[in-house]
Every structure is written in structure tokens, then in C-alpha cells.
């Protein structure tokens, strides 16, 4: 027999769930809310919004994607202006769905916020979609430029925007410009280090992505400093160790290639030289 609940019971559950989530006891939150949602008929829609909002927080931490998908959809229907729930529901669902529907969700969510850093984050996520899911759309390139420019208009000193600009320029095969944007990104990152509000995992991913792009362009000049900083955050990260190994491998390959071609051992190539005529392939295939 299903348990019966009163409005007072619901209020108590909301309070308990807030405590559970604060203490990172997310499974307890799910255990409290699941039976409530299956048997209680909410007369007060705001109570349901509060319940679903707390439930969503726990589901995200437990990575229960199917439930996250269903709850975010319901929350958007019940509270489209995010008056009583976290507006991130739009962006979470957008990440799950992707494509044109994902872009619509990002834009709808942006309408509810004024924080420029968060808006830029959403614009860059839209650029991501156009560079992946929608890369074959006829206007994909124009849309990328549009949202990158919108991001710069909001904050021309945002280091992540320049990282995305570099990636976009690689897709256009404008390799020299790409390198300049990556250098600008790393410079801005260091200049604003004290005020950057990002999770350690996101900062590490930024560092690792930047290293990958620089390796792709054959420019090793910044990689030591990026690796040094990332090691301060986490010195035994598998991805970081792999990238450091590949960096040393490529550096040695380039030196041997230079020696074999009677060029100064430390000669460095421009991105255009490195990518031209598959020189990068010749260097990587050179026997040690």
C-alpha cells in the first residue's frame, strides 16, 4: 500500500532533502522523494517545484541521466521563469539533448539571467554544438562567429572565449591566428588567476585542451608552463601524464627531424609550416 502524505509531510521532506544535499547524502534524498512523487497529488504547485529542484540536485550528483532528463523537462514546464527553481535546469537539459533543441534551451535559459560569465558559458556551449552536432549545417560557421562575437562583447578579457576562438580558427585552417588566440587565452588566464571562479576539474580540462591544441599546431613554447600549473592542481592525473609524455615524445621527434635536415636542433616551426604538406606526419613518423 502506498504511503499517504500531507502538505506538512512534504514541507518536512523538503527540509530533510536540503540537509541531505548539503551533507552530500544524495541517495537519502532520492529515497525520500521517489515514493512521494509516485503517490502524492500536489495541490500547491510551488511545493512540487521545490521538491523537484532538490531531487534534481541529488540526481545530478548521482549521474542518473534518464531521471535528470525527465525532471528537468517537468521543472521547465512548471517554472519556466525559474522563480522557485534553479535556472541551470535549462542548461543541464541542453547538454543532454544537444542539437538545435539544445541551442533553444540555452537561449531560453539565458533569458532568465543577467550574469555575463554564465551567459558567455552558454554562448560557448552553443558554439560547441555548432562545431560538433551541427557542423554540417550551412550556417554553422556564421553561427559560431556570431556567438563568439557576442561573448567578446560581454567580456573581451575572458580567457575561455579566446580558447574557443583558437579552436574555431583551426577548423578554418587559419593556424597562425589559432596560435595567437591560444597564447592570448593563456596570458589572460594567468593575469586573472585570482578572480577565476571555476571548479578544479574544469580548469584542468581547460589546461589539457590547450595543450592538445598546441601539440596539434606543433608549438611547444607554452606547454611547460601549462603543465607546471596543472600539476599544482593535480600531479597524478592520467590525462595530464599522458599529455606530458606525448609532449616530450614530440619534442624529441622535432629535434631529431631538425638534425636530420641540417637545421638548428631547437628550430621551431610556425603552425602553418608544421601543418603544411603533412610535415607533422613526417616528424611523427621519424624513427628515434
Predicted feature locations:
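Alpha-solenoid helical repeat scaffolds
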Residues: 27, 31-34, 73, 107-111, ...
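Amphipathic alpha-helical repeat scaffolds of TPR domains
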Residues: 8-14, 47-53, 57, 83-101, ...
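Structured C-terminal portions of repeat-based eukaryotic scaffold domains
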Residues: 25, 179-288
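N-terminal leader/linker segments that initiate helical-solenoid repeat arrays
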Residues: 1-50
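General structural concept
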Residues: 30-80, 86, 90-93
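Flexible helix-coil transition and linker loops at the boundaries of alpha-helical arrays
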Residues: 2-3, 37-48, 74-86, 110-120, ...
Amino acid at each position: 500500500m502506498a504511503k499517504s502524505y500531507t502538505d506538512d509531510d512534504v514541507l518536512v521532506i523538503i527540509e530533510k532533502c536540503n540537509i541531505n544535499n548539503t551533507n552530500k547524502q544524495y541517495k537519502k534524498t532520492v529515497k525520500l522523494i521517489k515514493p512521494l512523487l509516485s503517490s502524492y497529488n500536489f495541490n500547491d504547485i510551488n511545493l512540487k517545484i521545490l521538491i523537484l529542484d532538490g531531487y534534481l540536485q541529488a540526481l545530478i550528483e548521482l549521474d542518473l541521466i534518464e531521471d535528470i532528463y525527465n525532471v528537468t523537462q517537468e521543472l521547465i514546464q512548471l517554472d519556466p521563469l525559474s522563480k522557485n527553481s534553479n535556472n541551470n535546469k535549462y542548461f543541464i537539459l541542453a547538454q543532454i539533448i544537444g542539437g538545435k533543441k539544445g541551442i533553444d534551451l540555452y537561449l531560453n535559459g539565458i533569458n532568465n539571467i543577467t550574469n555575463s560569465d554564465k551567459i558567455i558559458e552558454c554562448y560557448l556551449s552553443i558554439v560547441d554544438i555548432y562545431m560538433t552536432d551541427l557542423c554540417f549545417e550551412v550556417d554553422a560557421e556564421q553561427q559560431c562567429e556570431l556567438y563568439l562575437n557576442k561573448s567578446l562583447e560581454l567580456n573581451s578579457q575572458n580567457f575561455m572565449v579566446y580558447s574557443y576562438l583558437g579552436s574555431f580558427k583551426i577548423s578554418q585552417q587559419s593556424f597562425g591566428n589559432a596560435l595567437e588566440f591560444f597564447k592570448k587565452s593563456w596570458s589572460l588566464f594567468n593575469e586573472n588567476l585570482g578572480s577565476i571562479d571555476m571548479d578544479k576539474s574544469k580548469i584542468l580540462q581547460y589546461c589539457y585542451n590547450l595543450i592538445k591544441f598546441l601539440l596539434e599546431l606543433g608549438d611547444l613554447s607554452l606547454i611547460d608552463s601549462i603543465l607546471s600549473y596543472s600539476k599544482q592542481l593535480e600531479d597524478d592525473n592520467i590525462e595530464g601524464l599522458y599529455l606530458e609524455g606525448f609532449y616530450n615524445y614530440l619534442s624529441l621527434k622535432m629535434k631529431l627531424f631538425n638534425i636530420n635536415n641540417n637545421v638548428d636542433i631547437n628550430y621551431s616551426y610556425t603552425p602553418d609550416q608544421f601543418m603544411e604538406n603533412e610535415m607533422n606526419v613526417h616528424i611523427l613518423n621519424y624513427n628515434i
